[in-house]
Amino acid sequence: MTEPKLATTHVVGEPTFEGLARFIERNNITKIFVMVGAGISVAAGIPDFRSPHTGLYAKLSRYNLNSPEDAFSLPLLRQQPSVFYNILMDMDLWPGKYCPTTVHHFISLLAKKGMLLCCCTQNIDGLERACGIPESLLVEAHGSFSSASCVDCHAKYDINMARAETRAGKVPHCNQCGGIVKPDVVFFGENLPEAFFNVAGLIEETELLLILGTSLQVHPFADLALMVPSDVPRVLFNLERVGGRMFRFPTDRTPNFRASSYRLSTGNGNGSKISSGDSSNSSSVDGYDQFTLAENDETGVLRDIFFPGDCQVSVRSFAQALGFGEQLDASVREGREIFERTRRREKVVEG
């Protein structure tokens, strides 16, 4: 077998913040698709799921669950609702509790500048909404705490009442059928919202993919990164590398040998769609280690970029390269001031 040659060039030119900014300006990029995960909310004080010792899963050992995912499953909710609601009291992700981060404001700024095609988030904390990302450009793939409903009859339940009962240590029950009420977040094994599958049509229009603060271990959300056209740059902002050989970054020295065969089997890079028939939320620890999707290996051209480290810091540097670092700083300050004023008013009312 003839080995593919090592990539020598990159579709954006120079794979740096400045090079990426020049690529955006040179090509008049206005259709940026953003995928975000729990890592962008850690700076707000919300733990992510998988970090050792500090992540949410690491804190679930006292419940003696078979797996951490069981805490977010309907069978356990029905059998032992107190487990989920005790976790809910610890998380306290109801609207207004946490302040959006620099990354949230960066995405909102992209929207204001007409550069955001879609923000698809795994997060259930609602901080994308809180920082002003328009609902028309936002897909909450795993739901949010902005509403609640009965798990049996699906009747809507007043979100403020659900929050008050939860904070009082009670399990909310439906006024109509008596079933257990939960926030409208997607549990493992539940179907994702229809809005998630509608974004597949946007994938074909994507001109740049930004991936921020996600482990890419939950499907079908992670599959979105496979669906953008094969010449579209994919940029990962994360503490550590994820995605296995889904990506090939400029620092990688080992070429991928199975790209063509896997691409043919998935239809990757041709606007392929995620089927709503496979719509349940599932978790995987493989991180795509067994796959390889570096489509441009054969041509000697790369399209992936990895900016390791704190995504808040990296995004601030990226915004600076784009020429709106000061606007981002101002947006963060204003957002913090509004958040603190609102919190003070709420404390006065509660007091």
Curated annotation (Swiss-Prot):
It is an enzyme of class 2 (transferase). Residues 260-284 are annotated as: Disordered. The active site is at residue 142. It is found in: Nucleus; Chromosome, Telomere. It catalyses: N(6)-acetyl-L-lysyl-[protein] + NAD(+) + H2O = 2''-O-acetyl-ADP-D-ribose + nicotinamide + L-lysyl-[protein]. Keywords: Chromosome, Metal-binding, NAD, Nucleus, Repressor, Telomere, Transcription, Transcription regulation, Transferase, Zinc. Its cofactor is Zn(2+). GO terms for biological process: DNA repair; rDNA heterochromatin formation. Its EC number is 2.3.1.286. GO terms for cellular component: chromosome, telomeric region; cytoplasm; cytosol; nucleus. Residues 10-325 form the Deacetylase sirtuin-type domain. Pfam families: SIR2. Binds 1 zinc ion per subunit. It comes from the Eukaryota. Its main location: nucleus. NAD(+) binds at residues 37-57, 122-125, 213-215, 238-240, 311. Residues 265-284 have a biased composition (Low complexity). The keyword Metal-binding applies. GO terms for molecular function: histone deacetylase activity; histone deacetylase activity, NAD-dependent; metal ion binding; NAD+ binding; NAD+ poly-ADP-ribosyltransferase activity. PANTHER family: NAD-DEPENDENT PROTEIN DEACETYLASE SIRTUIN-2, NAD-DEPENDENT PROTEIN DEACYLASE SIRTUIN-5, MITOCHONDRIAL-RELATED. Belongs to the sirtuin family. Class I subfamily. NAD-dependent protein deacetylase, which is involved in repression of RNA polymerase I-mediated expression immediately adjacent to telomeres. It is however not involved in antigenic variation and subtelomeric variant surface glycoprotein (VSG) gene silencing. Plays a role in DNA damage response. Also has ADP-ribosylation activity in vitro. This is NAD-dependent protein deacetylase SIR2rp1. The lineage of its organism: Eukaryota, Discoba, Euglenozoa, Kinetoplastea, Metakinetoplastina.
